[in-house]
Design a protein with these regions (language model features):
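Short low-complexity, flexible loop/linker segments enriched in glycine and/or proline
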Residues: 45, 170, 204-205, 245, ...
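Proteins enriched for Cys/Gly/acidic motifs involved in redox and nucleic-acid/cofactor modification
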Residues: 1-197, 211, 258, 280-291, ...
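Conserved SAM/AdoMet-binding glycine-rich loop
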Residues: 73-74, 82, 182-311
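Short clusters of hydrophobic/aromatic residues that line enzyme substrate/ligand-binding pockets
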Residues: 121, 270-273, 342-345
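Conserved N-terminal phosphate-binding loop of PLP-dependent enzymes in the Aspartate aminotransferase
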Residues: 242-243, 325-326, 341-344
């Protein structure tokens, strides 16, 4: 009898990609399942992202069904309550778990193959470092450093799924880093919902992590050639640790890249979004970064169409883009998410 086959599709950020790699690693570790292309697999696992709304996730389910009508489907990832309800209504035979239940993925797939109904939404936070992984790129190690965040952004539904910050211990992160280095990885992506607050709940900060990982401790000359990519950080946290983090970026092993989402150039909108900084503070932060590291690449995120945004607010956002000259601008239209405070506006 042939081994049941699974295909894992990923949508969204690098944190989601790390989880998709872990899902594949966990599923094949005990040799109970094999991996297959989407059109050939017995089970399709869809690791979804709902940061911009549920419609893209529902489209992913529909397209998966169209591509492989005979496969059973498991939905996981950042599954909000509204997405769960819509999937149950439109696709009642699709099983559902979420990002907090990665440890149950083998059980979920097994029950799915047996025709059982599975809904795993509740769940305590689990540590997602040091899990078996099947990497998308064999030389890139995506290392989750925490889950959840400390922000209360009015438009964000991810907080409903991920919850409050839980930093992974430095020793745990170092263990995965060292193992990945021995396995031949040359590039390390540090990922989470917000790298900027890593360590705040365990008496540390991101500068400690960057300095520890960028100072190689071994004797293998080949393993000394690696780079670290520091993921997204909220400006209010970067402001707290600015000097120490910028000092860590002087190590040649740390990519000169920062993802600092501004979201709006209007203080009125930023206040409504519950972003804990002003437009002036953001502009000064970017100036300080460029002064310390002239070659730094800066990416930012912008939300347009926030419910309280006026024409003048919009012009102020254009102004902050002109003043800070980000190398990368990710622009999104405001999406009303049920359960968020901005949904009431």
């Amino acid at each position: 009898m042939s081994m049941p086959s699974v295909h894992v599709s990923n949508y969204g950020c690098s944190a989601n990609l790390a989880e998709a790699e872990a899902i594949k690693g966990v599923l094949v570790k005990e040799k109970r399942y094999s991996l297959a292309e989407q059109e050939d697999a017995d089970v399709l696992v869809l690791n979804l992202c709902t940061v911009k709304g549920d419609h893209q996730s529902l489209r992913a389910v529909r397209q998966a069904r169209e591509k492989n009508p005979n496969a059973k489907i498991v939905v996981t990832g950042c599954v909000t309550r509204t997405l769960r309800e819509q999937v149950q209504k439109q696709y009642p035979d699709v099983n559902i778990t979420n990002t907090n239940n990665l440890h149950l993925i083998q059980e979920t797939v097994a029950k799915t193959l047996d025709g059982e109904s599975v809904i795993h939404i509740a769940g305590a936070k689990e540590q997602k470092a040091n899990l078996p992984r099947i990497r998308t790129n064999p030389v890139i190690s995506i290392i989750p450093i925490s889950t959840g965040c400390l922000s209360t952004c009015s438009y964000c539904s991810t907080k409903q799924v991920k919850g409050i910050l839980k930093s992974y211990p430095l020793t745990t992160i170092k263990k995965e880093f060292d193992e990945s280095l021995r396995e031949g990885c040359k590039e390390f992506w540090l990922t989470s919902q917000d790298n900027g607050c890593w360590g705040y709940d365990i008496g540390m900060n991101p500068a400690v992590l960057l300095k520890e990982l960028s100072h190689y401790r071994g004797d293998d000359e080949e393993q000394k050639d690696y780079r670290i990519r520091y993921g997204m950080t909220s400006p209010q946290h970067f402001l707290k640790d600015k000097e120490a983090v910028l000092e860590a970026f002087h190590n040649e092993r740390v990519y000169k890249f920062l993802h600092l989402p501004v979201q709006s150039g209007s203080d009125n909108v930023l206040k409504g979004m519950k972003r804990d900084y002003t437009a002036e503070e953001y502009e000064q932060l970017v100036q300080d970064i460029k002064k310390e590291h002239p070659t730094m690449t800066i990416a930012t995120d912008i939300i347009v169409g926030y419910p309280s945004e006026s024409d003048d607010d919009f012009e102020q956002t254009i102004g902050i883009i002109k003043n800070t000259h980000p190398h990368i601008s990710n622009i999104s239209r405001f999406a009303r998410r049920e359960g968020t405070t901005s949904a009431q506006l």
